[in-house]
Amino acid sequence: DCPSGWSSYEGHCYRVFNEPKNWADAERFCKLQPKHSHLV
């Protein structure tokens, strides 16, 4: 099960964030998201 606002695909949870970020800021942002989130 994925958190509210997230989508499931092949057993993984994904969510699109539209705010532009550089790589370092995006990585920090992802670490604040639910467990097992990945920077894509």
From Swiss-Prot:
Q: Does the keyword Electron transport apply?
A: no
Supply the alphabetized keyword list: Disulfide bond, Hemostasis impairing toxin, Secreted, Toxin
Q: Which GO terms describe its cellular component?
A: extracellular region
Show the disulfide pairing: 2-13
Record function comment? Interferes with one step of hemostasis (modulation of platelet aggregation, or coagulation cascade, for example).
Q: How does it assemble?
A: Dimer (non-covalently linked) of heterodimers of subunits alpha and beta (disulfide-linked).
Q: What is this protein called?
A: Snaclec LmrLEC-1
Organism for this UniProt entry: Lachesis muta rhombeata
